[in-house]
Amino acid sequence: MDELNKLMGDLTGYEAPTDYANLYISNAQDPSKVSNYVRDLDMRTALATVNYDYEGVHYTREYFNSYPDNIMAVRLSADQAGKISFDTNLENLINGTAYTNTVDGDTITMRDALSTNGLNVEAQLKVINEGGSLSTGTNGGNPAITVSGADAVTLIFACGTDYKMELPNFRGEDPHKAV
């Protein structure tokens, strides 16, 4: 058994997969005034879309996830200029031992470490606006970015850890550079 323990190494690197963050996109639209709401998933392109009308404006949300790039892209657009306005923020779900959540210009960066095994996790949300303006503040106590009067906006969400499938401790490089 001692030989097996030597081969296995320190087992503190093990942990079950877990969700790290919620991405919130909040607007001031009254849901009771939304019409023609349609959700769609194109299996050929892996593009999920939401289309709806609100107070005479047609809105489109497009979602795409890329496993090789470890990103999710969200595009929000409208058929009239200057109609995209919302707040966005990240919420930490793991409540680990090294939590930080900051906003700098167009990017929110959230870091933490799992309390059970010290796995480092980082998520970044970049907001790319076409027209309108960006400002920073807080939403529910979390750093937030507010988009006002944009023609369209693309959100790029990336998340990574220092997990590495390699004995003995299953740890690799800090995730910051990769994210």
Predicted regions, residues:
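Aromatic-residue-lined binding/catalytic grooves and analogous aromatic/hydrophobic interfacial grooves
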Residues: 1-179
